[in-house]
């Protein structure tokens, strides 16, 4: 699985490597704020899109809008109450057959900025 990361994290955030989940088809990364340990985490997940893959997003208390991340189509789920749930942005890289998502209790502009900063750091061998 190729390795991606968010390169434009808010101040104080860094990967908590003890929480990384990696398998053949999925990677989940948790970022924690070392300057403010009680701050909510940021999550980056990506998965290979293949037959039988399902992405589940709870939308009960969210406003959904179409969005573009670096030319790729996706959706932005803005929570109506961020004290209860995160904002989420998802997009699909059809060239590499990957679906990405970021979950964070941050503004629309901040989460979009992070999504646009996701970069490949290590290709699959």
Regions found by a protein language model. Give the residues of each.
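Short, solvent-exposed recognition patches
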Residues: 1-95
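Surface-exposed amphipathic alpha-helical segments
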Residues: 95-125
